[in-house]
Amino acid sequence: MMRNAQYKMGDGSILNYYEIGTAKDKLLLLHAQGTNSLSFNHVIAKLSKCYHVYLVDYYGHGGSSNNPEKYNLISIGNDMIHFIENVICDSVTVLGHSSGGLIAAYVAAYSDKCTKLILEDPPFFSSWGERRYNTYNYKDLSTACHNFLSQSKEKDFVHYYFVNQYCWNFFPEESRERIREKLGGFALKYREKHPNKNLKVLFWPKKFLEGFNGLQHYDPRFGEAFYNDSFNDGVNYCELLSRIKCKTLFMKAKTTIGENGLLQGALSDEDLQRVKSLIETMEIERFDCGHGIHVERPKQFVQAVVSM
């Protein structure tokens, strides 16, 4: 049975976390931006048979503190190291999905408690500096967060993001606004009736609603940190990655380069090879699916983790 608890940092910040399993080996899971630890529900039961699993909501997500001063890699990374040292109190395999992978890499670079590292499709180099402008995340979630914070009419970010997400650009132009208005109305009604539940929208594919799970507890100011690049906080990723000496697995999802060179995915194959050249101990496993590998390919995902 999964236990939910909170850990209070010395500065009063709260890290909400879940714990399950009694195995000797410890596993720390760090979720993607916009969701929370429960996004791993597809795989947690099987992982907990092999690991004592900890799942932490990092700041701006889930039940953890909303503190914009901590929405950067260094602050979150250092607090995750503190969590490992004071809650897990043991060596640990650290797995991070997407932006959680950036945090996991920081932990592996600066803590000898991290003995194995699993990177689930993190956006190394692509979300850094001017490169970020031509990525799907920047056009989508980051820009939606920035625009939401720049207005005062719309109060509910979940509904705002649904009707302003970048994927509407892939709908036929002649029917786009009609469909957006109709489905946006469904989304608004659901949000008004169920403000604390994961979003459900009639006719919207369940696969794509996964990205909205936990969004009702997301602080859009975290997305602003990716919009203005303050999340990276001047971190030199070449230096950071070269510090990682533990056994490392990189899970690579499919990447598509769209019109005008838009990176529709976390990172390019060139970025991946750059990461590989910096982490000497890294192996790569490719998955024929989108960015959420643990959601789209749960059996293959679990097998890869357990094989570590």
Regions found by a protein language model. Give the residues of each.
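Conserved loop-alpha-helix segment in the C-terminal half of the alpha/beta-hydrolase fold
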Residues: S242-D288
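Active-site loop/oxyanion-hole signature of alpha/beta-hydrolase fold enzymes
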Residues: Y58-L95, S99, Y106, E130-R131, ...
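Flexible "cap/lid" loop of the alpha/beta hydrolase fold
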Residues: I118-S175
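Conserved HGGG/HGGXW glycine-rich cap/lid loop of the alpha/beta-hydrolase fold
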Residues: S13, E19-G63
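Post-His helix in hydrolase/transferase enzymes
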Residues: V295-S307
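Catalytic histidine-centered segment of alpha/beta-hydrolase-like enzymes
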Residues: R286-P298
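Short glycine-enriched nucleophile-adjacent loop
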Residues: G101-D112, L117
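Hydrophobic, aromatic-rich cap/lid helix
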Residues: E174-E239, T255
